[in-house]
Amino acid sequence: MAISVDQTPAGKYPAKVHAKRVAARIQELGHGDSGIIYLEGQKTHMIEDSDGEMPFRQRRNFFYLSGCPLPDSYLTYDIKADKLTIFIPPIDPASVIWSGLPLSVEEALEIYDVDAVLSTAEVNASLAHYCSAQGGKKVFAIADQVSPHITFLPFQEIDFDVLKRAVEESRVVKDSYEIALLRRANEISSKAHVAVFKAATSARNERELEAIFVGACMSSGCREQSYHPIFASGTNAATLHYQKNDEDLVDSVTGQRRLNMLIDAGAEYRNYCADITRVVPLSGKFSPESREIYDIVLEMQNSSLAMIKAGVMWEDVHSTSHRVAIRGLLKLGILRSTEEELFEKGISVAFFPHGLGHYLGMDTHDTGGNPNYADKDPKFKYLRLRGPLASGGVVTVEPGIYFCRFIIDPYLSSPDLGKYINADVLERYWSVGGVRIEDNVVVTDSGYDNLTTAPKLPEEIERLATEK
């Protein structure tokens, strides 16, 4: 099913702007205003014990400074001269027979936002020339990403530390071109979610709905998924990153159709990712227990979104989401005690064990989040984004409530923590599995811009699921 969406943003991918941004960050970190930035694209790799190539995925840091998706490529950026050069593979007559003519140097210069395009055979000679022109100064590269045949010997100083940090910090704030790519990925992915909603009541297996999603994305220009899609029915939705996607939607033990399908899936458009989660009732209507949990999670997300703007501490937004979850579970009778005591004891982690969200861009879990996985507070241990939100950053907002026995049972059996959970009331909710709602938003100075258009109001999802 083809999906009609807005066209790709006009003009070239702004590689030169990105190179200047990275160079400025290197200078801010105290490394001067001259030198050569050197990066390599991803190499072609073969499948082990086979003559077939592995699926190719360009190195994100290389693409950020080049806009070039070609394998086996290189780049240099002369900071002082403000000259960005990419090096692309030359024509290999033997390969032309199988794969056709590759991009020429002249064509690449027209396509990419660079100052020069050369053959990969000229990388070392160009490095030596730059070094001579600069008086043998500094080259910046990323450790373990320099090919054995590349030589930096003419340079007086080689820095393998600052470049990776400078690129990853620069990638946090997106420019308008990047946001347009992210919006396109979200538009295509959101409409693919709708296609799944419409097929939910007739599908017989998780893989059928995954196939509908992936097919809708591919027919609209997204050949790759941002990550392995999650199509988790029934209690499978209690597993955060469920991978199988192959179980029947009628339970083999009870003979009953499972309640819901959690869909965590997003397409990758020109190296930029969407990361969207929705839940659809497989009968076309949420069960009472499913609807109660869904409403809590939706309120968790709405409360979080209301807080978002540049400078807000992400930990505060995450804490608010936990408090909303606690209040909702108290109202249902699943939890008992006071909101404050439950928050301090971290009881909500039994039902909401992951972080509220993360930066999004060329990687699903994008750079610059500065997580602290050693945090002793379980509420924050898996929070992939820490600190103040950056204007122009793109974040996921993905609260959830899950009924995972592996996680909850230790709380129930704990002499200290078991008293806070009403096991009798909880029994009614195991079959819900899990509910997560995830949108992708651009942080602005005054609020946010939600890129995700997939419906999330329960009434709208039910309408689409039963639409003929």
Swiss-Prot record:
Organism: Paracoccidioides brasiliensis (strain Pb18)
Highest taxon of source: Eukaryota
Residues binding Mn(2+) 2: 264, 275, 438
Cofactor binding note: Binds 2 manganese ions per subunit.
Gene Ontology MF, one: metalloaminopeptidase activity
GO biological process: proteolysis
Enzyme Commission identifier(s): 3.4.11.9
Role, per record: Catalyzes the removal of a penultimate prolyl residue from the N-termini of peptides.
Protein name stated in the entry: Probable Xaa-Pro aminopeptidase PEPP
Chain sites annotated for binding Mn(2+) 1: 275, 398, 438
Hydrolase recorded as keyword: yes
Gene that encodes the chain: PEPP
Requisite cofactors: Mn(2+)
Family to which the UniProt record says this protein belongs: Belongs to the peptidase M24B family.
Catalytic function, reaction form: Release of any N-terminal amino acid, including proline, that is linked to proline, even from a dipeptide or tripeptide
UniProt entry tagged with the keyword Metal-binding: yes
Keywords: Aminopeptidase, Hydrolase, Manganese, Metal-binding, Metalloprotease, Protease
